[in-house]
């Protein structure tokens, strides 16, 4: 998207208000944008995406085990069904996350958010910021 929306609108959509607004902004900032703008090394979403990936897996695994699933193979298969690029992409699209992300110029020109992988990574970063 060429002009991102205000992050506060995303808070209204999700029903979650960030105490630390800089964390939300970081979760919405792609590395390319950060470099183009000369922002600090810790201003982009990459680390939060890694954290978010782990958090999402932990939540899903906890729910599966608490829900009575105890077979390791079954837990792994169900986790793969519930935590994958398509599910994360769809979750991101449901809140129109791509409209809030600060994309690099090349990313915006190429509409990289149409790639499931890129949008899934943005959703992971958002989850990491929520955590």
Q: For the regions a protein language model found, what residue spans apply to each?
A:
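RNase III-family endoribonuclease catalytic core
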Residues: 1-131
């Amino acid at each position: 998207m060429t002009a991102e929306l205000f992050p506060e609108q995303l808070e209204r959509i999700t029903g979650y208000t960030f105490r630390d607004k800089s964390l939300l902004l970081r979760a919405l900032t792609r590395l390319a944008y950060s470099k183009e703008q000369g922002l600090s090394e810790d201003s982009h979403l990459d680390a939060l995406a890694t954290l978010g990936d782990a958090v999402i897996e932990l939540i899903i695994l906890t729910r599966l085990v608490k829900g009575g699933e105890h077979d390791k193979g079954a837990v792994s298969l169900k986790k793969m069904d519930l935590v994958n690029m398509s599910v994360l992409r769809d979750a991101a699209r449901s809140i129109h996350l791509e409209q809030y992300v600060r994309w690099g110029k090349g990313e915006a020109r190429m509409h990289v958010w149409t790639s499931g992988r890129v949008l899934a990574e943005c959703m992971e970063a958002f989850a990491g910021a929520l955590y």
